[in-house]
Every structure is written in C-alpha cells, then in structure tokens.
C-alpha cells in the first residue's frame, strides 16, 4: 500500500494496459514523489472502493482529488505538469490526436481482456487485433501519424505494441516491419522501461533487460 506521505498515489494493476499507459505518462513527465498501490488481477481494495465508486484502475489520488478515468488521468497529468507537453498547441491537431486516441480506446484496448479469455475468444480477439493493426500500419509513417513530438498518442499505442508478442499477435511482414521499427524506438525510451511492472517486463524479458 502506498505511503500517506506521498502527495500522489496511483492505484494500478500490474497487467492492465490502461494502468501501463498512465504510468508511462507519469514517467515521461518526470513526476516525482508518487507511489503506486499495486493490485493483483482479481484483487479488490476497500480503500479504492471508498475513493472510486467503480472500484476501477487506474485511479489517481492527489490530496483531495480523485481521478478514475484513464483518459482524464493522462490529460490531468499533462496539464498538471506542463513540461514537456504531450499534446500539440494547435486545436485542430489536438482534436485529431484525441480522435486517434479515442479509436484505440474503443477498438484496441478492449481486446486485451478477450486475449486473456478462453482459447476461442482469444483467437477471435487476436484476429481482430491483427486486422486493426494491419489497417493502421498500411499507411503508417510514425512522424506523419503522431506528429513531430512524443505525445499522449504514443503513450496510448506503446502499451498495445509491447503486448503483441506475448499474446502471439503477428502482422503481415511489410506492415509488421513498419510498426516494429516505431515500437523499438518507443521501447528504447528510459521512461518506457521505468513504466513497466515486473509482470509486464516478463512479457518480453530480453528486451526489458536491455
């Protein structure tokens, strides 16, 4: 359980793609003096239920503020710690980024629960993930797709790409190569390595050890 002396506490599961995304944003922002209250899969927390009526993770607590939607959390962190900015200033670009993030949240993130389900459900989710990522990668140019600066869009996509090998999701060679090169640059960032839970690090132990 996190120390009460910390000004910020993040309730997080060690194999939750949403929690990973929030931890990555916090590490990219260099947030100091925050604690992680780890919950294992299936573990419930009375403290969390008192704070969050949905009893969901990630949940961020900063003094009297409790935030429990991952998108709201990362946008709050981006505004609370303005440097480096993780969203463009231009309102049109911001809208485009938000739409891209929304599509990942709606289309890709929910598939991870199915990937942990029965073999039949997991196979269907794997095929759907492959289909969606192949479409994304078909015209993929990282700097065209995500802009010139590292952003919340990268932070949303990185936890997805990290889990593909673990869940045996493969893409056609041409599209897979494009995403793999981009993913390697994401995974090489020091903040990404720091964002990994022990469970997540074991998904790709050789890469996490580098």
Model regions: which residues?
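GST-like domain detector, emphasizing the conserved glutathione-binding G-site
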Residues: 1-137
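A generic membrane alpha-helix/interface feature
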Residues: 48, 167, 172, 207-209
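Short, solvent-exposed turn/loop segments enriched in Gly/Ser/Thr/Pro and often Arg
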Residues: 13, 152, 199
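GST-like fold's C-terminal all-alpha helical module
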Residues: 92, 100, 104-188, 193-195
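Extended, non-catalytic scaffold segments that flank or surround catalytic motifs
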Residues: 81, 175-178, 201
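Acidic/histidine-enriched, glycine/proline-rich intrinsically disordered or flexible terminal extensions
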Residues: 199-210
